[in-house]
UniProtKB/Swiss-Prot annotation:
Keywords: Acetylation, Cytoplasm, Phosphoprotein
Naturally occurring in which organism (per UniProt): Rattus norvegicus
Stated name of the protein: TIP41-like protein
CC terms in the record's Gene Ontology section: cytosol
Residues annotated with Phosphoserine modification: S265, S270
Length: 271
């Protein structure tokens, strides 16, 4: 399932007052990976860590939301909910650096499961997160509309020492009057479990908010005996068989006072 051939690219697309940016480049260098692992208090990071990859949606006034691997890993819970499976010990041993290393490996989620929903951007102006009962209109998304812009960005991927896959990717498509984004964490531990955490983001040009839906699905492989195993590697196909464990609907409401003459988004703050 690994995706190879990393050709760096930087794509910008304007959608009204919004600038959409998709940056893709090579995996992080080992020294940078070690430094980040220390910062995150994790003994190791995913085999393929794209620390500089990002998908950003930013208003000319500076506020917005972006999706990156580092912030996603900050949401990994290293202290509870650990999966105890047959391959865990073997996998951890394979990640211990050097045969003389006697350090006690701190508990951490070696599946890199994250409930990351994006990083809010802006200083004085920021999107306001408000719970809602509104849902993204999936029928609208099925309508045949011209795709003005499409991009997919891989944030991290790991084959769990050949015991499955853990990956995080984000893709966006822009139609004439709206855009739709899907951030997907997908975990498959062969013979054990499949888990999928999806964050969907939808904005229509005439609205003063975005809708954000987060769903977490999960099933033990033992409960999927009625499903063809060939679907286990296809997130889009297997999702319908995974029970929903959690669902959160939110509005990302725009600031009330937006600069009527926003600066060129090239110079808008991105932190």
């Amino acid at each position: 399932m690994m995706i190879h051939g990393f050709q760096s690219s930087h794509q910008d697309f304007s959608f009204g007052p919004w600038k959409l940016t998709a940056s893709k480049t090579h995996i992080m260098k080992s020294a940078d990976v070690e430094k980040l692992a220390d910062e995150l208090h994790m003994p190791s990071l995913p085999e393929m860590m794209f620390g500089d990859n990002v998908l950003r949606i930013q208003h000319g006034s500076g506020f917005g939301i972006e999706f990156n691997a580092t912030d996603a890993l900050r949401c990994v819970n290293n202290y509870q909910g650990m999966l105890k499976v047959a391959c865990a010990e073997e996998w951890q041993e394979s990640r211990t650096e050097g045969e003389h290393s006697k350090e006690v490996i701190k508990p951490y989620d070696w599946t890199y499961t994250t409930d990351y929903k994006g990083t809010l951007l802006g200083e004085s102006l920021k999107l306001k997160v408000v719970p809602t009962t509104d849902h993204i209109d999936t029928e609208k998304l099925k309508a045949r509309e011209q795709i003005k812009f499409f991009e997919e960005v891989l944030l991290f991927e790991d084959e769990l020492h050949d015991h499955g896959v853990s990956s995080l990717s984000v893709k966006i498509r822009v139609m004439p009057s709206s855009f739709f984004l899907l951030l997907r964490f997908f975990l498959r531990i062969d013979g054990v479990l499949i888990r999928m955490n999806d964050t969907r983001l939808y904005h229509e040009a005439d609205k003063t908010y975005m809708l954000r839906e987060y769903t977490s699905r999960e099933s033990k492989i033992a409960n999927l005996m009625h499903v063809p195993p060939s679907l286990f590697t296809e997130p889009n196909e297997i999702s319908q068989y995974l029970p929903i464990k959690e669902a959160v609907c939110e509005k990302l409401v725009f600031p009330e006072r937006i600069d009527p003459n926003p600066v060129d988004s090239e110079s808008a703050p991105s932190e």
